[in-house]
Design a protein with these regions (language model features):
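Non-ligating segments of multi-cofactor redox enzymes
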Residues: 1-174
Length: 174
């Protein structure tokens, strides 16, 4: 599942799909807080969507994710999120987002192949608020930048255009 959050074009022209980052350190906070262990992690480190037969709809996973990725489907009473198209990637196929991306901004492959084909520095360390998270998803940054500080980038962008901080509301898939 790829989620694209609402974009208010009067404040921003950037778009980014909200992909699961498949956190590795700390190990998948969404899975750690699930009281019924509905969110499983594959041996390859892919954090799976909640198992429907186990999910009790407590939404702990939604609140625990530092990236705001899991969404709760009220109708299905189930958490939904990207599972890296595990049915495809476990068969050595690209996930649909990477397959469909016309500019290859979303790319799937191993680290060595990635660094041979791309310019910049691939990092998997992200600062989000006060938390630093290491993930299995890499971002390409300038060589001198060792981590992606999302909070600082958002504050910098808001300051440039004089935009107020957004109101935080819970997001639900309906």
């Amino acid at each position: 599942m790829i989620m694209v959050d609402f974009i208010d074009r009067s404040f921003s022209v950037a778009t980014q799909p909200t992909l699961c980052m498949h956190c590795s350190d700390p190990v998948a906070p969404c899975a750690q807080v699930c009281p019924v262990m509905a969110i499983l992690i594959t041996p390859e480190g892919v954090v799976q969507q909640a198992e429907p037969s186990r999910c009790i709809g407590c939404r702990n996973c939604v609140y625990a994710c530092p990236f705001g990725v899991p969404k709760f489907d009220l109708e299905a009473r189930l958490m939904k999120k990207c599972n890296l198209c595990y049915d495809r990637t476990s068969q050595d196929l690209k996930p649909w987002c990477a397959q469909a991306c016309p500019t290859q901004a979303i790319w799937y492959g191993d680290y060595e192949e990635f660094t041979n084909q791309r310019r910049g520095h691939a990092v998997n360390k992200t600062v989000f608020g006060a938390q630093e998270v290491r993930t299995r998803v890499y971002h390409v940054l300038p060589e001198e930048q060792q981590k992606l500080d999302i909070t600082a980038l958002l504050e910098e962008a808001r300051a440039e255009i004089g935009a107020p901080a957004p109101d935080r509301e819970e997001a639900w898939v309906l």
